[in-house]
Each structure stands twice: as structure tokens, then as C-alpha cells.
Regions:
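C-terminal catalytic lobe of FAD-dependent flavoproteins
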Residues: 86-180
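Active-site substrate-recognition segment that forms the wall
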Residues: 1-122
Length: 180
């Protein structure tokens, strides 16, 4: 869409994967007893309690290879799976159990991994949102912000950190910082 308006910004697309485990202690990882969590280190891992699936979800954050929407494979990366499985066995051993399934997804990230939530400077009636690989958790808030931008051109929230005009989005060879 941005190309239609004469814009090209720096985005990196990676193929990520998540695994769902059927823990024999599933009640300990239910929504009522277990939080969404992030292991903020290098590498970074995150997980969700059992909700909607018959098991807890775990993944490495930005552990996948660069790709494009056209060239992605949907194939599970055994090395990425092993890193996640090893982490789970070491840090949450009672969450480990039979694998329900592993699936792939795409992250689309600006170099600074911050969201883009703004209108286009020369087209204030065009709202832009880029999720930076972790937007799904904020979908309802993004919907509210985008509807405010579409209806009034402004939001009740401070969107200055997420401006479309950030220099790093247009830098020729930006330093990529993908740590959350």
C-alpha cells in the first residue's frame, strides 16, 4: 500500500514458529493460573497459557530466518524447534509434554521494532499501522487508534514514538534492533 503513495520504508520479514504443548499438568498453565510471559534475554522466548488450544504456547521471539511473503516455506525449522524445546525443558519443565503442533507465521518489523501508527503526511486521510512482530496482542487498541485517526486525524493516545516520519524507517542501512 505504501508504494502506491510513493513510500518505501525499511522492513524486515522473518518466518517464525510457535509450538503448542499438551502438558500433563495443563491445569497449572490455564488462563486462570498462568500469565502471558516473556523471557527478555538473548535469545528471547515468550509463551501464553492454555487458551483456545489444548496446550500452552511457546516460541522464540525473532528466532527465524529472513524471508518474504512470497518465498516463505511454511516448513518447521528443526533448529528453532530445538531451541524452544530446550528452553521449555530447562525453565518450565512441567509445561513440557506431547507436541500438539508447531506452525509458522511471519513477523514484519521496522529496524527499531517499534510500531508505526500514524497518518501519511501528505495524505492525512490515510492511516498506517505496522505491528513490528508483536501487534496481535494490541489489536483492539490499534483498532481504536486507527478509527480515531480515520475519523478525526488524531488520537487520544500519544503516538509520537510511532510516527511514520521516524528517520530510521527511511535510513539507507539502518542498524536493526529487534530486542523487544
Amino acid at each position: 500500500m505504501l508504494a502506491h503513495f510513493g513510500h518505501k520504508i525499511n522492513l524486515t520479514v522473518t518466518q517464525e514458529q510457535v509450538t503448542y504443548y499438551a502438558s500433563p499438568h495443563l491445569e497449572d498453565y490455564s488462563l486462570e493460573r498462568f500469565p502471558i510471559w516473556i523471557w527478555l534475554d538473548e535469545p528471547c522466548f515468550y509463551g501464553f497459557p492454555a487458551f483456545g488450544e489444548a496446550g500452552a504456547k511457546i516460541a522464540q521471539d525473532v528466532g527465524g530466518q529472513e524471508t518474504t511473503a512470497e518465498s516463505r516455506t511454511f516448513e518447521i525449522d528443526p533448529a528453532a524447534f530445538q531451541r524452544t524445546d530446550t528452553f521449555l525443558r530447562q525453565h518450565l519443565p512441567t509445561a513440557h509434554g506431547p507436541i500438539i503442533y508447531t506452525k509458522t507465521c511471519l513477523y514484519t518489523m521496522p529496524p527499531d521494532r517499534d510500531f508505526v501508527l500514524d497518518t501519511l503526511p501528505e495524505h492525512p486521510n490515510v492511516a498506517v499501522a505496522i505491528g513490528a512482530g508483536h501487534a496481535f496482542k494490541f489489536a483492539s487498541l490499534f483498532g481504536k487508534i486507527l478509527s480515531q485517526l480515520a475519523l478525526s486525524g488524531q488520537s487520544e493516545f500519544d503516538l509520537s514514538p510511532f510516527q511514520f516520519s521516524r528517520p530510521i524507517l527511511f535510513a539507507e542501512n539502518p542498524v536493526k534492533e529487534f530486542m523487544v
